[in-house]
């Protein structure tokens, strides 16, 4: 079983890093101004999506598993008007991904099935469920980011 746990943790941690690398590749050609531009009257900007994914990981993994004491302000993830520089937003995102990947790689088989508790995630009974749920969430928003980058950079 230890080999399976090591394979699972290695693969899952690498997946988070692939999401990070993909996002970096997609947002590389856009400016800070474009990061905060929403090309539609609905939805979110790339910047707000990155704040949201960062907050999600810092809360559900950082605060709930690592014990970072991160306090999430979810509404602000979608309404922040500070328009921080792209590099700062990406650095915060990278730190969250690094924290998650490091945490996952430290998990034993027993750790993966350790109880996980968050009132907003009742269908995540253990850490493995939380790690996979947050990976799916990050990938979902990666798709939205890819779409928005394509919209913001397409030729008229």
Predicted regions and their residues:
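Generic structural signal for secondary-structure transition and capping sites
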Residues: 21, 32-35, 58, 98, ...
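Acidic/histidine-rich alpha-helical segments that form the ligand environment
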Residues: 81-115, 129-137
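Short, contiguous alpha-helical
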Residues: 2, 9, 13-17, 24, ...
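Hydrophobic alpha-helical core bundles mediating ligand binding, dimerization, or RNAP-core interactions
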Residues: 12, 16, 20, 27, ...
């Amino acid at each position: 079983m230890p080999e399976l746990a090591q394979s699972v943790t290695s693969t899952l941690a690498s997946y988070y890093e692939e999401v990070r690398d993909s996002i970096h590749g997609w947002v590389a050609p856009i400016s800070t101004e474009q990061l905060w531009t929403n090309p539609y009257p609905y939805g979110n900007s790339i910047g707000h999506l990155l704040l949201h994914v960062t907050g999600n990981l810092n809360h559900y993994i950082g605060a709930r598993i690592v014990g970072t004491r991160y306090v999430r302000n979810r509404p602000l993830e979608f309404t922040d008007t500070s328009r921080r520089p792209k590099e700062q937003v990406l650095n915060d995102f990278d730190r969250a991904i690094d924290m998650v990947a490091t945490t996952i790689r430290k998990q034993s088989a027993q750790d993966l099935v350790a109880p996980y508790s968050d009132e907003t995630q009742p269908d995540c009974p253990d850490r493995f469920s939380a790690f996979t749920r947050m990976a799916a969430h990050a990938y979902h928003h990666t798709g939205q980011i890819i779409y928005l980058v394509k919209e913001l950079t397409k030729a008229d």
